[in-house]
């Protein structure tokens, strides 16, 4: 992927927010108490990741862990989100002054997706077959397929949502790194031998 090669191989763009978020998703299945802490680290690395809060809750709901662990994990994420909200609301951050809801910005930002992803032809061409493949894999009973579909959709709509809610952020190419990672994970889910 052109975007991954450009923004992940140079030191100017830090990508710890993606690393912390993906490790948090992984740890939901392995060691759930640590996952919400990594989500907090991802938020403090780049506040852009807050858009993925609801898809993360959906991922927890669809994960293959016990009901009790799901409840505790969701509670820990809600507590982490409340703690982050309190820290941002009491601190002098730039995030207080930039909230400005403008619904026309959503459609303008949605229009720029083609321009932003113009060099990632493989990602664009794989989205439709991947969506259809994940749908059929989901019908076979693999729960992760639904979660990956929601995460891919969120990755596509995160930029327009941020543009609609703020007057500060725009659709920038490095914000599509999670999309590239989730497309790769989705391809792995389709070709996995697990039934």
For each of these PLM feature ranges, what is it?
Residues 1-3, 15-22:
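Membrane-embedded helix bundles of polyisoprenyl
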Residues 6-14:
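Short acidic/glycine- and proline-prone juxtamembrane loop motifs at membrane-interface regions
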Residues 14-17, 51, 170-195:
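Hydrophobic/aromatic-rich transmembrane helices and adjacent perimembrane loops
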Residues 21-34:
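Membrane-interface transmembrane helices that cradle and orient dolichyl/undecaprenyl
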Residues 50-79:
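Perimembrane helix-loop-helix junctions
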Residues 97-119:
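Juxtamembrane membrane-water interface segments that cap and precede transmembrane helices
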Residues 122-146, 160:
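Hydrophobic, aromatic-rich transmembrane alpha-helices
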Residues 143-165:
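Transmembrane alpha-helix segments characteristic
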